[in-house]
């Protein structure tokens, strides 16, 4: 595509403010997965109010309106779906959350399309190197994921300044190994972009082409765009209570307290995880209350609930499929055993991010441990199993009579009084950190549940293990404070773990 002009930003200077350094230590990072639950609707922008990343263009009369181009091919499953090929242009007729009604300008057919498979024509979103709605941290995870190498790069939107962009590049440092360098992209008042004020470009596309030919002050020449995995298509429109025959169970993945977990397919097309509930375990009404609660928790660090089957037993709960299974099993596997400490801490940061979301939503998990965290093919961690979670009014929740909970992961006040809060989840998170840094070992090794309860009442805490940094152990001890109110928030834990290695270093590279 051609140049995409910048609209001047008065708040941005063009005098070349110095930028700082953001190294990332030697570790593979996970691929960022865009939140599939976003229902943001993008409306057409009048040409007199173009945004950064758009340009004036005369369109065919037939193309008047919102025109999108396919980033990936899509084969329709339902009669009202519209199939399309990569690069095909379509006119958006109606927007329905994650599914839009569109007309192909090639075939003239109409139907529903997955909105995350397309991008607005003549925007940066059509470029393979542009990653929309991605944080600096997730950009690092994406670039350090398997399949990318030194010279891989992406352009992302600024997290703090709307309409601004940053360039993130994978480099190799003899001391630190694989690192990510970030460069702020500045806008000129009269249009155009620059990283270094000594050379400017009319559009970001021209800037990329220049730095693909020569480093010209960057850490290295830009080579290949960061690999972007094909997104999972949105769940079917209005498919909540689904027919049992629409689910095909393929492979049993495991069994838990309330039933089994299977890999299966919905309508023979969408790979899903299926939790089956043992008959008589709980009432359909109680199950639906839990399922409806879980459905409200939508974040890219939480396993997403898709649908349920409740008309007869066994009850099914349909969630997104995570290829590498539980974090506990992964850590104990050959592959997981090769993961280095920086990546283990990144796992912790991802889990803290998901729990920070739960914290903001005034929920509790009640059973946070490595067995209830799942891992994707690209090593993205997502929190699962909200079967015992409950919305709370006064930040207090009393366990039901006879409820089973894992002693070694549970805070003393929850063990002794049955009261669960987000702060008891923080205690459990500290135990989860122990699981992670020991590659899945059972907490309090050699001690029975009764021994643990007695030891905790006497102020005992697990000692630091050999490969655990002092700073990480300090975080564990914060989580294990006797007084719940003295334990940190998940928001704080996320911020500390996100920048565990870089807290005292700058974020951006000096201008070339």
Curated annotation (Swiss-Prot):
Quote the cellular component terms of the Gene Ontology held in the record: adherens junction; cytoplasm; cytoplasmic side of plasma membrane; cytosol; endocytic vesicle membrane; extracellular exosome; glutamatergic synapse; Golgi apparatus
EC code(s) of this entry:
2.7.10.2
- Effect on the protein of changing residue 3 to A: Loss of localization to the cell membrane
Gene3D superfamilies referenced in this protein's UniProt entry, alphabetically? Phosphorylase Kinase, domain 1, SH2 domain, SH3 Domains, Transferase(Phosphotransferase) domain 1
Q: What is the effect of changing residue 275 to A?
A: Loss of activity and no effect on localization to the cell membrane. Abundant localization in the nucleus
Q: According to the UniProt entry, where is the signal peptide?
A: none
Map out region (Disordered) in residue numbers.
Answer: 1-62
* Compartmental location: Cell membrane; Nucleus; Cytoplasm; Cytoplasm, Perinuclear region
Q: Which GO terms describe its biological process?
A: adaptive immune response; autophagy; B cell homeostasis; B cell receptor signaling pathway; C-X-C chemokine receptor CXCR4 signaling pathway; cell morphogenesis; cell surface receptor protein tyrosine kinase signaling pathway; cellular response to heat
Which domain of life does the UniProt lineage start with?
Eukaryota
Residues bearing a lipid moiety (S-palmitoyl cysteine):
3
Membrane disposition: Lipid-anchor
Q: Name one GO molecular function term.
A: transmembrane transporter binding
Query: What's the chief localization of this chain?
Result: membrane
Q: Which residues carry this modification: Phosphoserine?
A: 11, 13, 228
Q: What is the effect of changing residue 385 to Y?
A: In a breast pleomorphic lobular carcinoma sample; somatic mutation
Q: Cite the effect that the entry attributes to residue 275 to L/R.
A: Loss of kinase activity
Residue ranges of every copy of the SH3 domain listed in the record: 63-123
Is Transcription regulation one of the keywords? no
| Pathological condition linked to this protein in its record | Autoinflammatory disease, systemic, with vasculitis: An autosomal dominant disorder characterized by systemic autoinflammation manifesting in the first hours of life with diffuse purpuric skin lesions, fever, hepatosplenomegaly, and increased C-reactive protein. Additional clinical features include periorbital edema, conjunctivitis, urticaria, atopic dermatitis, abdominal pain, and arthralgia. Laboratory studies may show leukocytosis, thrombocytopenia, and autoantibodies. Constitutively phosphorylated and activated in cells from a number of chronic myelogenous leukemia (CML) and acute myeloid leukemia (AML) patients. Mediates phosphorylation of the BCR-ABL fusion protein. Abnormally elevated expression levels or activation of LYN signaling may play a role in survival and proliferation of some types of cancer cells.
Query: What information about domains appears in the record's comments?
Result: The protein kinase domain plays an important role in its localization in the cell membrane.
Q: Provide the assembly information.
A: Interacts with TEC. Interacts (via SH2 domain) with FLT3 (tyrosine phosphorylated). Interacts with LIME1 and with CD79A upon activation of the B-cell antigen receptor. Interacts with the B-cell receptor complex. Interacts with phosphorylated THEMIS2. Interacts with EPOR. Interacts with MS4A2/FCER1B. Interaction (via the SH2 and SH3 domains) with MUC1 is stimulated by IL7 and the subsequent phosphorylation increases the binding between MUC1 and CTNNB1/beta-catenin. Interacts with ADAM15. Interacts with NDFIP2 and more weakly with NDFIP1. Interacts with FASLG. Interacts with KIT.
Name assigned to this protein: Tyrosine-protein kinase Lyn
Organism of provenance? Homo sapiens
């Amino acid at each position: 595509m051609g140049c995409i002009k910048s609209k001047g930003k008065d708040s941005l200077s063009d005098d070349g403010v110095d930028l700082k350094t953001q190294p990332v230590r030697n570790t593979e990072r996970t691929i960022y997965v865009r939140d599939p639950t976003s229902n943001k609707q993008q409306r057409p922008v009048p040409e007199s109010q173009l945004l950064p990343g758009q340009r004036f263009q005369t369109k065919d009369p037939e193309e008047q309106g919102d025109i999108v181009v396919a980033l990936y091919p899509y084969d329709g499953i339902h009669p009202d779906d519209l199939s399309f090929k990569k690069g095909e242009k379509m006119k958006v007729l109606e927007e329905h959350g994650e599914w839009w009604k569109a007309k192909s300008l090639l075939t003239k057919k109409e139907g529903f399309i997955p909105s995350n498979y397309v991008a607005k024509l003549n925007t940066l979103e059509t470029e393979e190197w542009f990653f929309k709605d991605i944080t600096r941290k997730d950009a690092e995870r994406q670039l350090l994921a398997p399949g990318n190498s030194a010279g891989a790069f992406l352009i992302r939107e600024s997290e703090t300044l709307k309409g601004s962009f940053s360039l993130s590049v994978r480099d190799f440092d003899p001391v630190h190994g694989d690192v990510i360098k970030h460069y702020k992209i500045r806008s000129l008042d009269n249009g155009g972009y620059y990283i270094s004020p000594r050379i400017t470009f009319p559009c970001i596309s021209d800037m990329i082409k220049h730095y693909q030919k020569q480093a010209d002050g960057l850490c290295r020449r830009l080579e290949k765009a960061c690999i972007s995995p094909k997104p999972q298509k949105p769940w079917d429109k209005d498919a909540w209570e689904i027919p049992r025959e629409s689910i095909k169970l393929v492979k049993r993945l495991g069994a838990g307290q309330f039933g089994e977990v299977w890999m299966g397919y919905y309508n023979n097309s969408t790979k899903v995880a299926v939790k089956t509930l043992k008959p008589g375990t709980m009432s359909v009404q109680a199950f639906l209350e839990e399922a409806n609660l879980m459905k409200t928790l939508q974040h890219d660090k939480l396993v997403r609930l898709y649908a349920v089957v409740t008309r007869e037993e066994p009850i099914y709960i349909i969630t997104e499929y995570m290829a590498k299974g539980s974090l506990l099993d992964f850590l104990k596997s050959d592959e997981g055993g090769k993961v280095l400490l920086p990546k283990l801490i990144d796992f912790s940061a991802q889990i803290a991010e998901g729990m920070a979301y739960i914290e903001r939503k005034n929920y509790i998990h009640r059973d946070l441990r490595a067995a209830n965290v799942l891992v994707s093919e690209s090593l993205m961690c997502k929190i699962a199993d909200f079967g015992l979670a409950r919305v709370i009014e006064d930040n207090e929740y009393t366990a039901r009579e006879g409820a089973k909970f894992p002693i070694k992961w549970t805070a003393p006040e929850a063990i002794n009084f049955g009261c669960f809060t987000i702060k008891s989840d923080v205690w459990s998170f500290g135990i989860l950190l122990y699981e992670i840094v020991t590659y899945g070992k059972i907490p309090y090794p050699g001690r029975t549940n009764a021994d643990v309860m007695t030891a905790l009442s006497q102020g005992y805490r697990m000692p630091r293990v050999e490969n655990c940094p002092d700073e990480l152990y300090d975080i564990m001890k914060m989580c294990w404070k006797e007084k719940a109110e003295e334990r940190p928030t998940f928001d704080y834990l996320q911020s500390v773990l996100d920048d565990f290695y870089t807290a005292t270093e700058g974020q951006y590279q000096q201008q070339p």
